Amino acid sequence: MLKNNLDVRQELAALYRILDIYGMTDLANQCAAARSSENKNTFLVHQYGMFYNEITASSLIEVDNNGKPLDPKSPWLNDGCLNLCKWIFNTREDVNYYVHGHSENVMAVGGT
């Protein structure tokens, strides 16, 4: 079943909540992102400075495949996260979500 963009936003916001619940939020520059279901050349990221437990579907920001927000009034974004989004989503069309982190829990999952 194809997902609409609201579904993707809700799933990404839920992913941030799960990361928070499991303590995978120990660095400011960690991030999770999702490819938009409506435009495969855009992706969703969180606003820099928000705690993971504060992120909602409506607070996610859509950016183009060059890392530029679609809404020019968007708040500040994490440059490191945007670079990873560009590298991953522009290279791998089969990837729709990703998590970048440095906590021991994330490294354990990433290493299996």
Task: Label the predicted regions.
Residues 8-97, 106-112:
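An anion-binding catalytic pocket shared by soluble metabolic enzymes
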Residues 103:
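Active-site metal-binding loops of divalent metal-dependent hydrolases
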